[in-house]
Amino acid sequence: MTKFSLHKEGLLTIGFTLACTAVAFFFVPALGLCGICVAALVTYFFRDPQRAIAISKDFVLSPADGLICKIENALPPQSSELVEEMQKISVYLSPLNVHVNRIPVDGIVRKLHYVPGKNLRADYDSSEDENERQESTIEMADGRNVVVVQQTGFLARRVVCDLRKDQQVSAGKRFGIIKFGSRVTVYIPKDMPLLVSEGQTVVAGETILALLSETASLVTERFLD
């Protein structure tokens, strides 16, 4: 059975919603019933389920739950200081998706860059350059880099990233959350064979986006986290 838990970032919001619901019940019971529905939705949003993480050094895992809305070749963010085009995979998260983000590859966090911005709808292409976002560059053991961009959306108002510069990270581990409807984009080297396509639904920490090389094996064990 999958363990149900809540992300720590949601505890204060859930507590505040429950407190408002209690007050509403005292003054206007009908409004309190509406508050229960809101509290249930907020609790559902901040769920943090266990995932069956692939144990392998040969994969790029999805950093987010959602729908792959675009795959293309593009230059990575300037903050990465990478000058060659990479494969860009964008995942759109609806308000109903799990919003906890997970590390796509093993490596070391080399660069972290926060960009303040707007809150346009995350499914608009223009939102990538204009919305608030967090850009994180991870260097793998072979010297290649992967860049992850957490981006807010129309409902999302805050990006949370728990990474530190020079931190050693493991694929599949939690590293942050985006609060309410958003987009996560991952940039990977062009020589990595892709295993996904546009329109595909992906699961953070479980779905394999790409192989690190042509000879990498898909056979792997998994652990719950």
From Swiss-Prot:
Involved pathway(s): Phospholipid metabolism; phosphatidylethanolamine biosynthesis; phosphatidylethanolamine from CDP-diacylglycerol: step 2/2
**What does the entry list under GO cellular component?**
plasma membrane
Q: Quote the PTM field.
A: Is synthesized initially as an inactive proenzyme. Formation of the active enzyme involves a self-maturation process in which the active site pyruvoyl group is generated from an internal serine residue via an autocatalytic post-translational modification. Two non-identical subunits are generated from the proenzyme in this reaction, and the pyruvate is formed at the N-terminus of the alpha chain, which is derived from the carboxyl end of the proenzyme.
The cross-references to InterPro entries, in alphabetical order and at most eight, read: PS_Dcarbxylase, PSD-A
Tell me what this protein is called. Answer: Phosphatidylserine decarboxylase proenzyme
Q: What is its main location?
A: membrane
List every position bearing Pyruvic acid (Ser). S182
Instruction: Work out whether the entry's keyword set contains Lipid metabolism.
Output: yes
Q: Where is the active site?
A: S182 (schiff-base intermediate with substrate)
**Keywords, A to Z?**
Cell membrane, Decarboxylase, Lipid biosynthesis, Lipid metabolism, Lyase, Membrane, Phospholipid biosynthesis, Phospholipid metabolism, Pyruvate, Zymogen
Q: How is the cofactor bound?
A: Binds 1 pyruvoyl group covalently per subunit.
